[in-house]
């Protein structure tokens, strides 16, 4: 592909609600400080559960950020997403009344959608009859509704889509939005992901797969790349990026966080939950992203890894990095911010995209916290326990999902 003829795409707005903070400023300050947001589950009684910990969003009042009447019609994952989108649009300084709304689109992922709403309405149906469930039940619970609410809220008439590629979805959303602008279909896109399924059925389902950590100590639960890692910790929240065609952004004097330069997406075609042996699919995806952006492996200085704290993921992802980067794998920095946020599933790529853009913009690489016992079989620079000031030119964000979905986005530092 001849990337010289393609339009350039930059990030001009960021928004998030996640376990480390309900705004970008709050979250990034806590990420830089290495504060882990994992704690006891409060969303429901865990007395009969082996899993006791999650990374919950705290002190989120939807009525403070969304019209109360509208918030009542939204599931929690949509409330998070709308709040994050509002922040991203405000942050961008974009005057919505002055742009062509047919050239502004949305791609927002959710892996599971309104699962707690489904549980609540099922209980109500059993108690009162299923024809007496909420009339908002269906639009609240379907996964595409957060994307639809963005479009309705801001009057966006470009493409509006919802990738449901599990834990790769948020990164797929960013990459697909990047391509839509680069290839001339839209001039601006809101993109990212959102998830909220810390509920009895959500936790129970992943626990029955033996995918979740059952530790009691929050500091020894989400521990990517640690020798004692034993499963992921469920998180919740949303991350939204506003992408814009470079010349349009420059024409209005927009603040630019970073440039998006490459995107890769593929499938392992191996197993419905396990990654391909040796991380072959992930490695191929990284190569696709590098080639798409015309970037060579030695130019990458930081990778925000998928890093779920499961034995298979962390091992396969590390092997994939070594395969793609060779000797340079030992020179670049790799970290998993899931050590602080937990795993946001379909929302993970959006939040981690926000963090990767900020890492480039602020010249600060976040840590993998609580990494106390490094796995001797992995041995890369995982930025253990303390983030560091470092200016890198290119960074990569990886996401891998059930079904064999792989997604990777390459970002470039903006020099003005």
Regions found by a protein language model. Name each.
Residues 8-12, 36-39, 217-293, 301-302, ...:
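Condensing-enzyme catalytic core mediating Claisen C-C bond formation in acyl metabolism
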Residues 47-56, 113-117, 196-222, 264-284, ...:
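Active-site-adjacent elements of ketosynthase-type condensing enzymes
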């Amino acid at each position: 592909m001849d990337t010289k003829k393609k339009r350039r795409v930059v990030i001009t707005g960021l928004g998030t609600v996640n376990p480390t903070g309900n705004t970008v400023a709050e979250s990034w300050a806590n990420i830089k400080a290495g504060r882990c947001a994992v704690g006891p589950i409060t969303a429901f009684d865990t007395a009969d559960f082996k899993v006791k910990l999650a990374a919950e969003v705290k002190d989120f009042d939807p009525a403070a950020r969304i019209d109360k009447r509208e918030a009542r019609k939204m599931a929690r994952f949509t409330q998070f997403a709308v709040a994050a989108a509002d922040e991203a649009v405000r942050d961008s300084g974009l005057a919505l009344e002055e742009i062509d709304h047919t050239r502004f689109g949305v791609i927002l992922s959710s892996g599971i959608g309104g699962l707690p709403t489904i549980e609540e309405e099922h209980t109500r149906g059993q108690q009162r009859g299923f024809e007496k469930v909420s009339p908002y039940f269906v639009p609240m619970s379907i996964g595409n509704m957060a994307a639809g609410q963005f479009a309705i809220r801001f009057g966006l008439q470009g493409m509006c889509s919802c990738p449901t590629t599990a834990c790769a979805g948020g990164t797929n959303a960013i990459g697909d939005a990047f391509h839509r602008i680069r290839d001339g279909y839209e001039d601006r896109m809101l993109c990212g992901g959102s998830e909220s399924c810390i509920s009895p059925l959500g936790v129970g389902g992943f626990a029955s797969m033996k995918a979740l950590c059952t530790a009691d100590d929050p500091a020894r639960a989400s521990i990517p790349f640690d020798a004692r890692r034993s499963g992921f910790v469920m998180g919740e929240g949303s991350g939204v990026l506003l992408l814009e065609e470079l010349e349009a952004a420059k024409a209005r004097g927009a603040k630019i966080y970073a440039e998006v330069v490459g995107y890769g997406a593929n499938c392992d075609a191996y197993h419905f939950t396990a990654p391909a042996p040796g991380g072959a699919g992930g490695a191929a995806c990284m190569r696709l992203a590098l080639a798409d952006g015309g970037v060579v492996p030695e130019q990458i200085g930081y990778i925000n890894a998928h890093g779920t704290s499961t034995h298979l993921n962390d091992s396969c992802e590390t092997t994939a990095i070594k395969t793609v980067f060779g000797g340079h794998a030992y020179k670049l920095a790799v970290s998993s911010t899931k050590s602080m946020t937990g795993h946001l599933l379909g929302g993970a790529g959006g939040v981690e995209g926000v963090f990767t853009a900020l890492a480039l913009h602020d010249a600060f690489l976040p840590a993998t916290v609580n990494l106390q016992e490094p796995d001797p079989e992995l041995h890369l620079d995982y930025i253990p326990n303390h983030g560091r000031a470092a200016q890198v030119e290119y960074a990569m964000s990886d996401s891998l999902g059930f079904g064999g979905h792989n997604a990777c986005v390459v970002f470039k530092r903006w020099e003005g």
